[in-house]
Curated annotation (Swiss-Prot):
S-adenosyl-L-methionine binds at D198, R241. Contains an N-terminal dimerization domain. The C-terminal region contains the S-adenosyl-L-methionine binding site. One of its GO terms (biological process) is pyocyanine biosynthetic process. One of its GO terms (molecular function) is protein homodimerization activity. Coiled coil: none annotated. The gene is phzM. Belongs to the class I-like SAM-binding methyltransferase superfamily. Cation-independent O-methyltransferase family. SUPFAM superfamilies: S-adenosyl-L-methionine-dependent methyltransferases, Winged helix' DNA-binding domain. Homodimer in solution. Probably interacts transiently with PhzS. Involved in the biosynthesis of pyocyanine, a blue-pigmented phenazine derivative, which plays a role in virulence. Converts phenazine-1-carboxylate (PCA) to 5-methylphenazine-1-carboxylate (5-methyl-PCA). This is Phenazine-1-carboxylate N-methyltransferase.
Length: 334
């Protein structure tokens, strides 16, 4: 086998075995290894005793996770957390909830991937016998865990109040989920006022997350269906990771609701992972296929979002790149 074929084989093997790595990260997170190590339980023997396993098996797991720089150290000198493993801890701002939800519900959704791509039925529906949002509605604990998972991955939200002027303005966070975007804006701009809309059964996490702001009457939570109506007279309507879950007709209906409800000089702001039409990044197209597996959603190209806004009666004013393959697209009434 020549060098070219060896490189191709190595690349293929790395891709095919990628799931094994993610499963080991999931196991470490489910067992709480990062928290145990932070507390000083840092050897194979003590970790095994803490989780009810065997030192040799824990050693093999930790050896793999150290090799991929999730943790550092060894059983002789003790394991230690890295910036990556700190994200697995059960603390505010970690990725723990995201890793667990991805490693459970979303892992199951990808299992029937071949059947899903052949039939057009999302993998989640094939795995669970119902669509994603029906499952979340039927299982409140899963709904809560999903919102916490989404909260963990909202790395772009703290950029929004820096890029948009919220001084003395009112905004509507449509489908605001955990309330993390609303919280970021209100903490950054004391004169702003917010309304967060989501399904009635989904407001519990946001209520906890925004408790101090609710007490100060700077924000109100509204339960309802965004495809029926949205709160009126807002200056800014935020659609963060919403239209990726919606088909064309539903997206246009939502944009129409926002256009009808907003103040005269209002803006709609789409915050969405978009795909470059000319050079799609690996992560953006991976997220796109994941959206199909989860809920029959899709990530559009930036040009497709601009076109969608135009057909919804809006003219795009600016497009800003954000972290994690995300773009902010600001539009006014056309």
């Amino acid at each position: 086998m020549n060098n070219s074929n060896l490189a191709a084989a190595r690349n293929l093997i790395q891709v095919v075995t990628g799931e094994w790595k993610s499963r080991c990260v999931y196991v470490a997170t489910r067992l709480g290894l990062a928290d145990l190590i932070e507390s000083g339980i840092d050897s194979d023997e003590t970790l095994a005793a803490a989780v009810g396993s065997d030192a040799e098996r824990i050693h093999r797991l930790m050896r793999l996770l150290v090799a991929f720089e999730i943790f550092q150290g060894d059983t002789r000198d003790g394991y230690a957390n890295t910036p990556t493993s700190h994200l697995l801890r059960d603390v505010e701002g970690s990725f723990r909830d995201m890793v667990l939800f991805y490693g459970e519900e979303f892992h199951a959704a990808w299992t029937p991937a071949c059947e899903a791509l052949l039939s057009g039925t999302p993998g989640f529906e094939l795995a669970f016998g119902e669509d994603f949002y029906s499952y979340l509605k039927r299982c409140p604990d899963a709904g809560r865990r999903f919102l916490l998972a989404m909260k963990a991955s909202n790395l772009a939200f703290h950029e929004i109040p820096r890029l948009l002027d919220f001084r003395g303005r009112s905004f509507v966070d449509v489908g605001g989920g955990s309330g993390e975007l609303t919280k970021a804006i209100l903490q950054a701009e004391p004169s702003a006022r917010g309304v967060m809309l989501d399904r009635e059964g989904s407001l519990g996490v946001a209520r906890d997350n925004l408790s101090s702001l609710l007490a100060g009457e700077r924000v109100s939570l509204v339960g309802g269906d965004m495809l029926q109506e949205v709160p009126s007279n807002g200056d800014i309507y935020l659609l963060s990771r919403i239209i990726g879950d919606l088909d064309e007709a539903a997206s246009l209906r939502l944009l129409g609701n926002c256009r009808e409800a907003m103040a005269g000089d209002g803006r709609v702001v789409v915050i969405e992972r978009t795909i470059s039409a000319s050079e799609p990044s690996p992560m953006s197209v991976l997220w796109d296929v994941h959206l199909f597996m989860a809920c029959a959603g899709r990530h559009r190209t930036t040009e497709e979002v601009v076109d969608l806004l135009g057909r919804g009666g809006f003219a795009v004013e600016r497009i800003v790149d954000l972290p994690m393959e995300t773009r902010m697209i600001v539009a006014a009434r056309a």
